[in-house]
Amino acid sequence: MEKRNLGKTGIKVSELGLGCWALGGFSSINGIPMTYGDVQENTANEIFKTAFLSGINAFDTADSYSLGNSEKRLSNALKEHREEIHIFTKAGIYPSNLEPIPMETDLSYHNLLSTLDRSLKRLNTKYVDVFLSHKPPNSEKELENI
């Protein structure tokens, strides 16, 4: 698979990346499913490995995907290839008891750093290649707090 420069970062990523939301397995909040379905861990491992062997080196996950389980599964499946892959993870939304959609936004500096720390632990790595805000700020004030 062809690789392309990711802007001016020096990172070369595959033309196709793998989104990992559904690969964390089933999770729900207040009975509301937070995933596409119940992808079993062995199936997720096969998908991760097949993607890697097919030339995909960009994997997009998030702290909120299956309540962090997507990050754990990605780490477990590809730990021996960490230097060959690029991990993109996101922060800024988290589970809550809100209705009808049980997610809240927190783009504060403190929350972003603490979320990154938790992601690094779940991913069993010292770094992520790209760290993203899961959604844009709702206001100028929210942007200033980042």
Positions of PLM-derived features:
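Generic enzyme active-site microenvironment
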Residues: 58-61, 88, 127, 132
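Glycine/proline-rich, positively charged
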Residues: 31-32, 99-146
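Active-site beta-loop-alpha junctions enriched in small/polar residues
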Residues: 21-23, 62-64, 90-94, 133-136
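A short acidic, often aromatic-flanked loop/helix-cap motif at beta-alpha or helix-coil junctions
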Residues: 11, 95-96
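N-terminal binding-site loop/beta-alpha segment at the start of enzyme catalytic domains
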Residues: 1-86
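Glycine/Thr-rich phosphate-binding loops of Rossmann-like dinucleotide-binding domains
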Residues: 26, 69, 97, 138-141
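P-loop/Walker A phosphate-binding loop and immediately adjacent motor/lid segment at beta-alpha junctions
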Residues: 82, 94, 144
